[in-house]
A protein has these predicted regions:
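Short amphipathic helix-loop junctions that connect adjacent transmembrane helices
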Residues: 42-56
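Cytoplasmic helix-loop-helix junction between adjacent transmembrane helices
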Residues: 113-151
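Short hydrophobic/small-residue motifs within alpha-helical transmembrane segments
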Residues: 65-70, 153-154
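Helix-to-loop junctions at the C-terminal end of transmembrane segments
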Residues: 72-84, 167
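Structural signature of the two symmetry-related core transmembrane helices
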Residues: 85-100
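Pair of pore-lining "gating" transmembrane helices in MFS-fold secondary transporters
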Residues: 17-45
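Helix-loop-helix hairpin linking two adjacent transmembrane segments in secondary transporters
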Residues: 109, 139, 146-180
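Helix-breaking motifs and short loop linkers at transmembrane-helix boundaries and internal kinks
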Residues: 52, 103-109
Length: 180
């Protein structure tokens, strides 16, 4: 191959790798934040309607999640862990915690789930971002970095639209559906 053909072929491979990195991180953030943190928002009216929670307890659940996110964000600075492992575990735990919200109606279980879920979403956000940005820098593909951060918005829009379409099925089905 000529130097130009080699350069073009290498560029194509790097572009494909960069796209995969950015989209993978975007999906991770959509799940961790869009579902793990913010699915509660479109589900809260259904929880209020079916009487499983009142507005005061809904506020407490949101506060537990915020506290967990704060704890998770602060502890990221001291955790010395494999980023990929944290992201994979964070996504799996997000699935489990989301399903748990739909299979119980015990407030203190919900509170614990929201607290832990907040920390997990922070860890997943920070470590997926760090890994993705470092990998994009290695590929000299900085232009893809913004795609990563569309993930939370994609997740929030997705959960909102899905609940608008399937809200008649109830909050429990919504939680379980988002978890699966």
């Amino acid at each position: 191959m000529t130097p130009l053909a080699t350069s073009t072929a290498g560029s194509s491979v790097h572009s494909h790798d960069a796209r995969r990195v950015a989209l993978g991180c975007m999906v991770a953030l959509a799940v961790a934040l869009g579902v793990g943190r913010f699915a509660f928002t479109p589900l809260l009216p259904l929880m209020l309607q079916n009487g499983s929670i009142d507005i005061r307890h809904g506020g407490w659940l949101a506060s537990f999640n915020y506290a967990g996110y704060f704890i998770g964000a602060i502890t990221c600075a001291v955790l010395r862990v494999d980023h990929a492992r944290v992201v994979r575990a964070g996504l799996a735990i997000t699935v489990v915690l989301t399903v748990v919200m739909g299979v119980t109606d015990a407030f203190w279980v919900w509170a614990l789930v929201r607290l832990v879920g907040g920390a997990i979403s922070a860890w997943t956000f920070v470590f997926a971002s760090q890994w993705g940005l470092r990998r994009l820098a290695e590929l000299d593909a900085h232009r893809w970095s913004g795609v990563i951060y569309t993930g939370p918005g994609v997740g929030i829009v997705g959960t909102g639209l899905l609940m608008s379409a399937a809200g008649g099925l109830g909050a429990n089905v919504g939680w379980i559906g988002f978890g699966l």
